[in-house]
Amino acid sequence: MEKQTRLSDLPDELLLKILSALPMFKVTLATRLISRRWKGPWKLVPDVTFDDDDIPFKSFETFMSFVYGSFLSNDAQILDRLHLKLNQKYSASDINFWVQVAVNRSVRELRIDLFGKTLELPCCLCSCITLKELTLHDLCIKVVPAWFRLPSLKTLHLLSVKFSSDGFVASILRICPVLERLVVDGTKGNVMITNIDVPTLRNLSIRNSKGKGTYVEGSKGFVIKAPSLTDLNFEDTLSNFLMFEPMPEVIKADIQVICDQSKNFIGSLTSIQHLSLCSLTSKTPYPACTVFSSLKYLELCTCSARWANLFACILNAAPELRSLKLKSKHKFNYNDPMTLWEEPAVVAKCLSEHLEIFEWRQYEGTEQERNVAGYILANATCLKMATFSTRCRNRNHRMLKKLKSMDRVSKACRLVFD
């Protein structure tokens, strides 16, 4: 009979992987960790999560003792990541102490979840030159001291963070002098205009679509000024105001908005190469003279009844476009039929000289859609492949026959039904 291997008999390297993958502080696991065999590997664990979820109140003191005892190890190694997931209420001094010990262990990533409670920013972070990534989740920030700095922070995640006023968002961004990546998921509190002004920012991701939009007096939304930005991901179904300052370095953007504005929307992305756009705006969201001379790939969402007119405008503004994808990315249910497609009087330069790939997902074969498809096939002289994805599985269906019968100016174009 083979001898069974006990967990405590495993080599330190394997124990480190196991410890790093587990929430550390369930009482049963804590009891094992304080045994002599586990003390050595625990001090070497590079990824630690303090999670007090499901800790009974009577075991709270045991939990606190374990956390303090673990942190007070004198010979602990470098800590790559610390996650404080704290459902109970802790004093600012407790949190500051835990973060201080992590700073002493050269922590690189820090995440704090407080389940709606207020966080007093740990002052010890001001001296931490190793911290590169900070995530704040489900908490409230009421004070950002003028002297506070995060000197080496490259990535900041603000997830369901509640601020007391507009100025606090700008304040927390100002304390990050070398910030390159910002993620904002949900805006809470009394903030009306979220002002993102970060000269060093390279990557920005904003998701403001949780809950239902409600009427507010005045403007509510975002002002973005990030001249060094190269990658933008922006989803906002709640705001009524958007303003993008010039961002000449952006090469890739995924934008989904319902805000009905013009001229201050995607017109700032003049160097864009890859654009994915969903907009319910009834106006062209950039100045009439705008040219997207570097745009090679366009994905346009067809969930709005007005998408076809926006589509025609962008074709004229993107003379170098080589790949075009039409797709309904959302499950919105609009009662309005597709706005009447008006064929442009002049064929867009991208169709006559450059477009090679055309793809249409969720193609329904309505009269308006057929007119759009026919226009592209009849004018895209360089087209190599046109793919139509439909719910129809019958290759002899009338809808597919109509597509096959359409004139194709490009003899090299291959028609594909997916």
Curated annotation (Swiss-Prot):
It comes from the Eukaryota. Residues 4-60 form the F-box domain. This is Putative FBD-associated F-box protein At5g56560. CDD domains: F-box_AtFBL13-like. PROSITE patterns: FBOX (PS50181). Residues 340-390 form the FBD domain. PANTHER family: F-BOX DOMAIN-CONTAINING PROTEIN, F-BOX/RNI SUPERFAMILY PROTEIN-RELATED. InterPro entries: F-box-like_dom_sf, F-box_AtFBL13-like, F-box_dom, FBD, FBL13/AtMIF1-like, LRR_dom_sf, LRR_FXL15/At3g58940/PEG3-like. It comes from Arabidopsis thaliana.
